[in-house]
Amino acid sequence: MLPRLFLTILPVCSPSISNKTSKKFRDAHANHVFLFEMDLNNTLSFFGKQLKLDTEEEISKVIDQIRKHLNLEVLDFRGNTLSVLAGKLIAESLKTRRELKECIWSDMFTGRLKDEIPLVLDALGEALTASGCRLTTLDLSDNAFGAGLSTSLYNFLQSPALYSLENLILNNNGLGLAGKTVGKALCSLIDASKKAGTPLKLKKFVCGRNRLEVESTIALSDAFIKLGTLEEIRLPQNGIRDDGIIALAEAFRMNKKLRIIDINDNFCCPEGAIQISEVLSDLQFIEVLDLGDCVCDDPGVLAIIAELDKINRDCLKKVVLSGNNITSDVIDEIGACFNSPKMCHVKVDISVNMFGKDFDSAKARHGKGNIDFGRRGDDELLSSDEEEEQGAEDASMEEDAFNTSRETVIDRSNLHEASADEMMNDLMNKGFGCMKIEDNQQNSNGNGMVSFLDKSLKLDTAESAEPVVKVIAAASSMKALELRGNTLGIAAGNVIAKALESHPELERCLWSDLFTGRLKNEIPPILEALGKAMMTAGCKIKELDLSDNAFGPIGADALKDLLESPSSFSLEVLKLNNNGLGIGGKQIAKSLTECLRKSIAVGGENRLRLKTFIAGRNRLENPGAHALAATFKALETVEWFDVRQNGIHEEGIRALVAALKHNRNLRYLWLEDNTVLPKGAKALAKTLESWPKLEVLNLSDCLIRDAGCNYIIDHLNPQHHRHLKNVYLCGNELTPPVAKLLIQKWSKFDGLTPKPVLHIHTNSFGDEFSDVAGMAPENVNVGDEDDDLGSLDGDQEEYNSKSSDSEDADLDDDDEDDDEEAEIQIIDNGESQLKLAMDRIDRLDIDFESRFQEDTARVILQLSAPLKSCKMSEPALQRAIEVAENIVRRVESVKRNPIPATTQLVNNIVAQCAGTGVKAETDWGYGADPQVISRLFSELVARGHFKLELALLQRFFPSQ
């Protein structure tokens, strides 16, 4: 009688019955209605519940629901994380579920160790076999299997429960060479299913973003050929080349019922496209052909469209040819094909190609409803008329209703980033410590930002940090924590770290200028505590800014555990500007390399994809450069790289350039104020073609001279570097004849909109400055004549050659100062001596846009030697005062609390001057004359500076 009861209940539960009547019936027959609804609903979903199944209590709640479900055909575990215990207990509960048909088990192991996953996979595979179920759909996407899980994955794919499989989705598993295992497993499964009398008839296979490359693709193709039943093959973003494409083409031919082919973002090249075109006539049911970003070029595209005419055109719905270097030479053939009456129903994507100046006319002729040219600004030969959105999705990856399913959508969402112009302004005006990547939500605590920016908090004890801890604890969601402009002690750091443990959602740590006035040995324990807290919480950090914290090499050691932990696998922005790293740069590089290794081992989306690396003013020198080179060669993902003012010589520069060659998305490269020299510039110039997205190149103050500047301009190509915005060649001893030549060559960029700007101010134009400036168009910046360094005479050229070209030259400030002293002593002529002193003072003032703290003190201390050598000549003194005042104004613009930046400047100078009675922790070796420094301070005080430090100055530098 139970079935009759169900029939009686059905009309009562119908949506057409009023809510009041339905509720009354439910109240009267609650048990029967519950049973009936569970029977109709064949799906049990835990999707997005973010369950962390560790304890038996948590696991039992899930198991109870599995056991109570009367007709469990679909089990959806997406977005939860299973421990080994959970996997085994859930597997046990599935052994009786013979009716199970679909297992949606993607994103099921977040935060689990790689040796835990195979144990769960083994248990679940055994359970499916024991249950006797016959699955039609298996989705294991977004689980970081990697190559290390080959055995367990192979065994799982041998289960008789998969003989009936129709849909297999293995998207974003980090398979790599484990793709060969999947191919072999499928071949074995095909053979076993045939022997069992139920041959496998797989219809859909999805395996995107898995680094399959050639070997794994060939293995999978062998399985596809044996199958012959596939209707949908999706293998986007797998680095497939040459032989892999050829193998796939043959596999396509053997699967006559193919409807969807998606090999977006692989390397077909013209040869591969031609191979694919030759099999299209065998595929009469094809609906979607996605060859976006496959570098097919004109010949490959022409071959494809020629063969499309031979298929069943009524079936064809969409063709994606975006990002294939298609030129206007073939646009008429493409238009004629897809605008024809028999093909005008087909949606065609040809955006992000190379139509250039013909874009508008081509679109006018052929851009009818079915052909999508995309935005004009997306064309590879044009520049957008409006600011391009950072991280915009490639049009070729857009999904629509007929080719999208919940199993196959590939998420390409990116974090919002600030416009490049805003970041550039911060860089040039405030220095890196003031630079922030904006977030539209950052001012709202409800949207994830907790900020104590410039609150001038002096947090020494746990009690003093209590207000901060309370705010952190009260935040329901804290994705960003900004502590810049405060000072943190050990006790306060520990309690704040403890508060972080309750915020696993933390992504952005904006912690620059956090240790003002602290001792060096205080900083590492705080860094370690904060890092440990984030690791304990399971944070996935995307941005870490520790700039302007003078922690030195010991700070780099303190960051080791954090940078090598899973919490840093997600790191996209790392800013370590002005930290005094020195040899600690090698440790940072080593930690990033280890982080990359571990993340790759875990697999999938866990791979470290660092985009921004800023480590200017850290005295990295050549050893640090070589260490970083090894790291960034392996990373391949950096977009913003800055190591300005690090004393890196030509050899180190060449190593960095060779490494960055592998980072094809590089947009910003800052090597300013290192010793690149012409040879280094030549090596860099030859690498420029590797960076088609380059926007800013800064080689100011790099001593690359005429030859180096010429190399750079010659190798910048308007056809290739379409995104270029600024090139800085300032302060490189560029002479007028070569400057005029470069201005002429720069006109090759006149076709770009907007035109990129070439900066060549602060060079050696001398009396010909007006001539050079007169030649310069609006997109060439020669600066003001007052900034020009004047003509190079023979003696100066020789001096610069000796001090800069020698492969053994040591750029340490101490040695450089000694060399210059020696050079001054051999000059007898008073006028020459004054000229050289003035030149040295001018050089200290070159492009002083972002130096502060120790750097500012170093420059003022270095003013002592040239002033003393010319016996404080009035012209030299006035010029030195101008330089010093420029520095002080910069320092005054930097707001620091509780100790003002100007006070820090005075403290550093006092400690480095003999006779003050203050002993420096480290002697910088300038030997500054206290009388000269005293005179400078007197003049600066007279001009209204150092009001807060007046008593300090009177004590250590009494007026002369």
Curated annotation (Swiss-Prot):
Molecular function per GO: GTPase activator activity; small GTPase binding
GO BP, sorted A to Z: cell division; embryo development ending in birth or egg hatching; nuclear export
Domain of life: Eukaryota
Residue runs in coiled coils: none
Region (Disordered): 370-408, 777-819
Pfam families xrefs: LRR_6 (PF13516)
Predominant location category: nucleus
Record's compositionally biased regions (Acidic residues): 380-401, 783-798, 806-819
GO terms for cellular component: cytosol; nucleus; perinuclear region of cytoplasm
LRR repeat coordinates: 69-92, 132-156, 162-185, 227-254, 313-340, 475-498, 538-561, 568-595, 663-685
Cell compartment(s), UniProt: Nucleus
Chain's role: GTPase system comprising ran-1, ran-2 and ran-3 is essential in nucleocytoplasmic trafficking. Ran-2 is a GTPase activator for the nuclear RAS-related regulatory protein Ran, converting it to the putatively inactive GDP-bound state. Required for correct chromosome alignment and segregation on the metaphase plate.
Protein name, per record: Ran GTPase-activating protein 2
Organism in which the protein naturally occurs: Caenorhabditis elegans
Gene name in the database record: ran-2
